[in-house]
């Protein structure tokens, strides 16, 4: 139990900014996510490309490969000096490894310079320029820019444009990079918005992350703020960090590069504000603790955090304003214990200052102030209906049960009066859930009523048997009266056995048998009546019909016996035998269709038998025709 004068604070949810209506980051990299991303990048090298993704990706997160010398040796042993891509991966990887120097021959330098041409793809130009920059070799930026611009006009894909941004960041600041910088605005226009929360290219998350990394790298290089709105930066951030598990190294590398760019650039640094700890961490003191960090969960210790205002959700009245947070370790704290706020919900508007690069730096937190409820002035009364007898009142103190029983019948009503107060402040409370439950001790029947406060916040429940007989099914008996108090802001919800009440309904209205209100009792079995089968015809009729059906076959056999069957032309040629067997098989199939198969199955088998029988019959008739012609 909290001591008097204190309240409990529960942090519920981070909502959108109230003052600026700017978007709030919904996805970012927690410390656990950062470690998981590092694990995705820290894989055994399988190629120079995979080494590049691992080494440079880890460096973006402020880490490095476990064995720098081994990584450097791998790069040198796998370097192909005649391949521009290989040189790019080696140059960029060795650049972030301390003490890893790679010597380059004149032939290799000439190869890279030759690749910076209009005839090369944008990807080749990017790799060549970045390799020359990584190896510290001289480069004519104006010529490279001309080749890049000419080639980019032929390759208008998003990937080529992003690679052009990366390329420009390696060129001299003296070069006129305005045309390349203007491509950023065109790329932003090609982004797709999803639900007002996400912004991405249709090519997917990886290219979106590479675009963010390339944009801020180039803008830091030329010293110009990118043409991206703050809301768009947050939408891009939500897209990039929405995925937590990565199957490919390239995707993990792109996310790491974007995270580094968003946490370390000269123009836009998104701020992530999250409550510190769970609700139980702050039960005994009114302290709001916040973690303020970058997208990589790096604490922004240099930030200044202050409360703009706090408003009651119910009344919208301002209860706090212009209060600074204090930095305790890596956590910002606001102690408002002395204010003694009533229990309820409050919207805290918090602003993070200290750097003009901060965006999404005004957030609104929904805070719940909890307290303990106390029950006072509990009176149980029996009131005569014609008021000829003075009411009998008994006062009960929570959590004791009233002694004796109370009677409610056709002559007197039963009434319950009580008040609810805040244990900490003494203020009156009106919780959302205040119920009176009456439980029949014999049948288990339960009836629940809502207790309503009057204009003085005194709760009253009155039981008039003539008005409440429908709720009770006119079931007389002894009922246990429970008082139920509950609310989301209460630390001590109450279920109190207050008293036993004998309720008597007029006997002429009472049912002969009181049924339990248990909804789970077995229901009466339903007896189904099926339609009687139709009478079948006599057996004589069925036999007569069968004989009539078979009579043509019997007549055929009789005529064959009488005049003889002409089988002189029957041959045992394969076509003749197959034809007759096929014909017999089709007759047999008709029988099987009648007894077992459906129409579609029968048609499938009939198609096979019919085809074979047709071909055999055609062959048989052709042979008979040849015989007749010969004779």
From Swiss-Prot:
The lineage of its organism: Eukaryota, Metazoa, Chordata, Craniata, Vertebrata. Residues 23-540, 593-596 are lumenal. GO terms for molecular function: ribosome binding. The chain crosses the membrane at residues 541-561, 572-592, 597-617. The keyword Manganese does not apply. Glycans are attached at residue 106. Subunit of the oligosaccharyl transferase (OST) complex that catalyzes the initial transfer of a defined glycan (Glc(3)Man(9)GlcNAc(2) in eukaryotes) from the lipid carrier dolichol-pyrophosphate to an asparagine residue within an Asn-X-Ser/Thr consensus motif in nascent polypeptide chains, the first step in protein N-glycosylation. N-glycosylation occurs cotranslationally and the complex associates with the Sec61 complex at the channel-forming translocon complex that mediates protein translocation across the endoplasmic reticulum (ER). All subunits are required for a maximal enzyme activity. This is Dolichyl-diphosphooligosaccharide--protein glycosyltransferase subunit 2. Keywords: Endoplasmic reticulum, Glycoprotein, Isopeptide bond, Membrane, Signal, Transmembrane, Transmembrane helix, Ubl conjugation. Belongs to the SWP1 family. GO terms for biological process: protein glycosylation; protein N-linked glycosylation; response to xenobiotic stimulus. It comes from Rattus norvegicus. There is a cross-link at residue 154 (Glycyl lysine isopeptide (Lys-Gly) (interchain with G-Cter in ubiquitin)).
């Amino acid at each position: 139990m909290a001591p008097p004068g204190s309240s409990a604070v529960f942090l519920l949810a981070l909502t959108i900014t109230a003052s600026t209506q700017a978007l709030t980051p919904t996805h970012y990299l927690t410390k656990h996510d950062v470690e998981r991303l590092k694990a995705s990048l820290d894989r055994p090298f399988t190629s120079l490309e995979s080494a590049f993704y691992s080494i440079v990706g880890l460096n973006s997160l402020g880490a490095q490969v476990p064995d720098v010398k081994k990584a450097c040796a791998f790069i040198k042993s796998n370097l192909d000096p005649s391949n521009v891509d290989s040189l790019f991966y080696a140059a960029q990887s060795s650049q972030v490894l301390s003490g890893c120097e790679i010597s380059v021959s004149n032939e290799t330098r000439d190869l890279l310079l030759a690749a910076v041409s209009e005839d090369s793809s944008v990807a080749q130009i990017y790799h060549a320029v970045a390799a020359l920059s990584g190896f510290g070799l001289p480069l004519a930026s104006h010529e490279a820019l001309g080749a890049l611009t000419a080639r980019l006009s032929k390759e208008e894909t998003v990937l080529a444009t992003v690679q052009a941004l990366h390329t420009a960041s390696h060129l001299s600041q003296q070069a006129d990079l305005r045309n390349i910088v203007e491509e950023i605005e065109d790329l932003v226009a090609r982004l797709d918005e999803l639900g007002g929360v996400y912004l991405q290219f249709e090519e997917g998350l990886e290219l979106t992350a590479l675009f963010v990394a390339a944009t801020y790298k180039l803008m830091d290089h030329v010293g110009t703020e990118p043409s991206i709105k703050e809301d768009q930066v947050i939408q891009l951030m939500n897209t990039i960090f929405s995925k937590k598990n990565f199957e490919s190294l390239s995707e993990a590398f792109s996310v790491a590069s974007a995270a580094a760019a968003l946490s370390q650039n000269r123009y836009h640094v998104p701020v992530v504000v999250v409550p510190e700890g769970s609700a139980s961490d702050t039960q005994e003191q009114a302290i709001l603790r916040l973690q303020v960090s970058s997208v990589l969960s790096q604490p922004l210790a240099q930030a200044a955090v202050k409360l703009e205002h706090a408003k009651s959700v119910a009344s919208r009245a301002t209860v706090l304003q212009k209060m600074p947070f204090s930095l305790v370790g890596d956590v910002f704290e606001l102690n408002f214990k002395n204010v003694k706020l009533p229990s309820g919900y409050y919207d805290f508007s918090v602003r993070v200052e200290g750097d003009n690069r901060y965006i999404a730096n005004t957030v609104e937190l929904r805070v719940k102030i909890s307290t303990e409820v106390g029950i006072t002035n509990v009176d149980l009364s029996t009131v005569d209906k014609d008021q000829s007898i003075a009411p009998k009142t008994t006062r009960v103190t929570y959590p004791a049960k009233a002694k004796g029983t109370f009677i409610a019948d056709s002559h007197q009503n039963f009434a319950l009066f009580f008040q609810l107060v805040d244990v900490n402040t003494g203020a009156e409370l009106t919780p959302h859930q205040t119920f009176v439950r009456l439980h029949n001790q014999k049948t288990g029947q339960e009836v629940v009523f809502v207790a309503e406060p009057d204009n003085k916040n005194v709760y009253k429940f009155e039981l008039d048997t003539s008005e409440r007989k429908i709720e009770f099914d006119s079931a007389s008996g002894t009922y246990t009266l429970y008082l139920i108090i509950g609310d989301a802001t209460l630390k001590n919800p109450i279920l109190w056995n207050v008293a036993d009440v004998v309720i008597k309904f007029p006997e002429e209205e009472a049912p002969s048998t009181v049924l339990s209100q248990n909804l789970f009792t077995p229901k009466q079995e339903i007896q189904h009546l099926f339609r009687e089968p139709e009478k079948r015809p006599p057996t004589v009729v069925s036999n007569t019909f069968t004989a009539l059906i078979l009579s043509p076959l019997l007549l055929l056999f009789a005529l064959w016996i009488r005049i003889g069957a002409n089988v002189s032309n029957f041959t045992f040629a394969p076509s003749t035998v197959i034809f007759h067997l096929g014909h017999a098989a089709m007759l047999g199939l008709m029988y099987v269709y009648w007894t077992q198969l459906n129409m579609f199955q029968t048609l499938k088998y009939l198609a096979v038998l019919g085809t074979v029988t047709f071909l055999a019959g055609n062959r048989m008739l052709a042979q008979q025709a040849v015989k007749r012609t010969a004779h």
